[in-house]
Regions:
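N-terminal helix-turn-helix DNA-binding core of bacterial DNA-binding proteins
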Residues: 2, 7-50, 70-83
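Conserved segment of winged-helix/HTH DNA-binding domains
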Residues: 75-99
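Alpha-helical residues within the helix-turn-helix
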Residues: 43, 60-61
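Amphipathic, soluble alpha-helical interaction motifs
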Residues: 15, 62, 93-96
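Base-recognition residues in the alpha-helical recognition helix of bacterial helix-turn-helix
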Residues: 29, 54-57
Length: 99
């Protein structure tokens, strides 16, 4: 039982590490409202295309987002909407701590 819990926490830690970057949080916040092109995400984040692509690749590798191509444009969408619930909880914790 302890090993199962330890394994679960290790997986959770890896996923949280994937979320632990301001640019990735911005990307996920935008994708929570629907699909978006890489170009639009680049403008939102304010980084170069290769940096945004690396952020998206990490999120894709963790099963949080997926992509699709339409011609030369790549679009991303959130496939783990529960991550938004985590943001709500984390924001609430920050509000409570600031009181």
């Amino acid at each position: 039982m302890a090993m199962d819990k330890r394994h679960s926490f290790a997986k959770l830690a890896r996923m949280l590490k994937a979320l632990a970057h301001e640019s990735r949080l911005l990307i996920l916040d935008r994708l929570s409202r629907g699909e978006c092109s890489v170009g639009d995400l680049r403008e939102l984040v304010g980084s170069d295309l290769s940096t945004v692509s690396k952020h998206l690749a990490l999120l894709r590798a963790h099963g949080i987002v997926e992509d699709r191509r339409e011609g030369t444009t790549v679009y991303y969408r959130l496939i783990t909407p529960g991550v938004c619930n985590f943001f709500t909880c984390a924001t609430q914790v920050l509000k409570e701590r600031s009181r």
